[in-house]
Curated annotation (Swiss-Prot):
The keyword Cell inner membrane applies. Part of the ABC transporter complex HmuTUV involved in hemin import. Responsible for energy coupling to the transport system. GO terms for molecular function: ATP binding; ATP hydrolysis activity. Transmembrane segments: none annotated. Belongs to the ABC transporter superfamily. Heme (hemin) importer (TC 3.A.1.14.5) family. The complex is composed of two ATP-binding proteins (HmuV), two transmembrane proteins (HmuU) and a solute-binding protein (HmuT). It is found in: Cell inner membrane. This is Hemin import ATP-binding protein HmuV. Its EC number is 7.6.2.-. ATP binds at residues 34-41. It is a peripheral membrane protein.
Amino acid sequence: MLDIDVSNLSIGRQQVLTSLNLSLEAHQFVAIVGENGAGKSTFLNMLAGELPYNGSIYLNGRELNSWDALKLAPIRAVMEQHQAAPEGLSVKELVAMGRYWSQESDADAEQRATQWLSRFDLTPMGERGIETLSGGEQQRAHLARCLCQLDKDLPGEQLLLLDEPTSALDVYHQHAVLHEIKSFSQKGNLVLSVMHDLNLASLYADQVIVLGNNCIQHVDSPESVFREDILERTYRTPVHVSSHPSFLKPMIFTEPRH
């Protein structure tokens, strides 16, 4: 579904990432991890079409840069790390903006938006201005907009790009949101999400991409990647890995510095 063969990616004169060779199939939730400055957001921005690259990126067999914007809209949606919240829009209007590509009526767009407001526990806030919401509520609203954008009668082979989608959420909403994202991937779609919480990545991701030293260091299952030697090398801090008693997934504990 997504084939990446990029020799290098630069911002200005600074080379940020090199040797990006990767093929990812649908039906997957893929977490992108690595320390600050490893290029996680840059990698995601490249896939969002916001940065030029040397090489090729194919989405569903077609070069990413050759897609018409309106035809790409129902196939790829992006939630940035610091998503702007335009003043003057209600929460429902923001979510309905995801339907800009469609030919449906305003009433149909509003109906879909209403459904996604409910799924993200935002119905009581639908008529409020987006700027009045807390950071976590705004984060859920922008994610609802992305999934409203990708809401099709026959879903499949769609790409959802997320940059730290749970960073401002409480524990309840972290799991509620990740459940929705996981469900979306299981319907034949591909999710790539930058994540700093390794334990959430372990619980929800099917694969993990580890970035470091300007390139991809590892691509594998959480069980294969979340090992003490790999994590200590990646994050330069002592790490202990055990197994979750119920889900048998790696659980990561870091040690404080003395």
